[in-house]
Amino acid sequence: LCISDYGGISNAHEVQRIGETIGETGFLAMEAGMDMEMPKAIGYGEKLKEMFRSGQADTELLNRTVLRVLEAKFRMGLFEQPFAMDGESCKKIFEEKEGAELSLRSARESMVLLKNNGVLPLSGKIKKLALIGPHADCARKFFGGYTHLCMMESVYAAASSIAGVEGSPESGQIGGAMLPDGEPVNYVPGTKIQSDEAELFNDILRLQKPGCRSLLEELKERMTDTEILYVYGYPVAGKDQSRFEEALQAVREADVVILTLGGKHGTCSMATMGEGVNAADINLQECQDAFIKAASVYGKPLIGIHFDGR
């Protein structure tokens, strides 16, 4: 079964200029083998229906497409059980031990060690370890786009970026949900990225993933004989260096330094990269690049953990 990206046929017509009408674009997509249009019928809408009714388009093409959709539904048992599982049944599957083990294995095997000059693995004899970066004290940064956390926090996004959905930049209707109780929306300094450094987003994390520990919490749990010096240091985007001095002081005091680097994957105005959030520059954020250079002059072992994005 071949399914379009959200707004894919509309994009082909409006941006790529394929087809004289949206119906013709839909016909060309169906002829090429696309069975379903998402998220709603536009190319596969009234104009394409009229092409089939009038005989302008061969109904055999429609029959083949409908057949593939029906076959997929029969294979999945959707005619016998057309509704989603109830809460308890769904929860039972989500909490299966085998699934958790596979998820952990996948996470471990997806990590890439780019370079190691003998710093790793960390010695148990480290007295002071500096942990610096915006990802270290927030477990949300472990979760990428389209995870439950990402989608729930996007409800509070000041602007949507999901292609093909009302409220997206393409629709010209930017500006939707705001924080509850009239709370102002805060942004990463000097950027249009909405900050998630608010209690509301911590509550979402605790609600959905109550046992998920941050990097800081995990290090404290595992390195009980080491003093962990945590400092925020710099944001996930932009040029802000206002917290550098406190972080550099931690670098000077520490035996080893861990820097969390990269942006925040997600969607809408809540992320630096993800669904509909593009970047023209693949380098590290300017503030992070500047901090690495500033920290390197002290000659301490620096470990960079790149979380996501640039």
Predicted ranges, named:
Residues 1, 16-32, 67:
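Catalytic-core region of carbohydrate-active enzymes that cleave or remodel glycosidic bonds
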Residues 3-6, 10-13, 18-19, 44-59, ...:
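C-terminal non-catalytic regions of proteins with extracellular/luminal or membrane-system context
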Residues 26-27, 61-70, 104:
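Short, well-structured alpha-helical segments that form the helix of a local strand-helix-strand
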Residues 30-40, 44:
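Mobile "lid/hinge" segments at catalytic clefts and subdomain interfaces of large enzymes
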Residues 36, 58-59, 80:
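Residue-level detector of short coil/turn "hinge" positions at structural boundaries
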Residues 45-46, 67, 71-92:
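Conserved, charged catalytic cores of large soluble enzymes
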